[in-house]
Regions:
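N-terminal intrinsically disordered/low-complexity leader segments
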Residues: 1-18, 201-203
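Helix-turn-helix
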Residues: 11, 22, 26, 30-64, ...
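Conserved acidic functional residues
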Residues: 15, 28, 118, 171
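Hydrophobic alpha-helical connector segments
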Residues: 68, 82-110, 163
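Amphipathic alpha-helical packing segments from all-alpha helical-bundle domains
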Residues: 75-78, 93-96, 128-151, 191
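Amphipathic C-terminal alpha-helical segment
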Residues: 105, 167-184, 196-203
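Amphipathic alpha-helical segments used for helix-helix packing
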Residues: 108-129
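All-alpha amphipathic helical-bundle segments outside canonical DNA-binding/catalytic cores
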Residues: 132-133, 150-167, 184, 188
Length: 203
């Protein structure tokens, strides 16, 4: 999957890497549970157990911290999807394994939907950085699915169309599961994906 350079480059900070990572983890938990705009930097400072000076040395502004959180979520998503796909035996099963990952994720008590959609909903209209990161994350996933689809459908155009359909199922399942508080949308999406894959291979 494409590990594009989205987000904030933490290598430019003078604060220790472990401290930055801890701040990001605390911010991620708070942002994801309650929303970005409802959580202030002072609350993050308290949660991380660092001084306000150190917090701002690590992340000069909240937008940079949000970018770092989203970059971490992108990496987590990539790892989870790739791990599930790697365990599958056939090209068809590799496509369907994405939905197995979603079902496991949806079953987690902390699941609150797609962090990128959530962030875009809050800040996409006012933060070009957040909008770009969210867009690049979705484009990266689309490209990854297209690569998997090409193993099932040799025709490039047909593979890209199948990938667009399967990615849309995954995106819709995330939103539906978050609202319903239920992992069943992953199962429904997997069944629909199987139907689409089988239809594409018969064409």
């Amino acid at each position: 999957m494409n590990t594009q350079g989205t987000g904030y480059d933490m290598a430019t900070s003078t604060v220790e890497a472990d401290t930055r990572a801890h701040i990001v983890a605390v911010a991620d938990e708070l942002f994801y549970a309650r929303g970005i705009q409802s959580v202030g930097m002072d609350e993050i400072r308290t949660g991380a157990g660092v001084s306000l000076k150190k917090l701002y040395a690590a992340f000069p502004g909240k937008e940079q911290l949000v970018a770092a959180v989203l970059t971490g979520r992108h990496e987590y998503w990539e790892h989870g999807i790739e791990q599930a796909v790697a365990a599958a035996a056939t090209p068809r099963d590799r496509l369907l394994a994405m939905y197995d990952f979603l079902e496991q994720w949806f079953s987690d008590d902390t699941f609150r939907g797609c962090g990128f959609i959530n962030a875009f909903g809050e800040l996409g209209s006012t933060s070009p950085t957040v909008a770009r990161i969210a867009r690049e994350h979705k484009e990266s996933f689309q490209e990854y699915v297209a690569g998997l689809a090409a193993e099932v459908v040799p025709d490039r155009v047909a593979a890209e169309e199948l990938a667009a359909q399967l990615a849309l199922l995954a995106e819709g399942a995330q939103t539906t599961a978050a609202i319903a508080g239920d992992s069943a949308p992953a199962t429904h999406a997997r069944r629909a994906a199987a139907t689409l894959i089988d239809a594409a291979t018969r064409a």
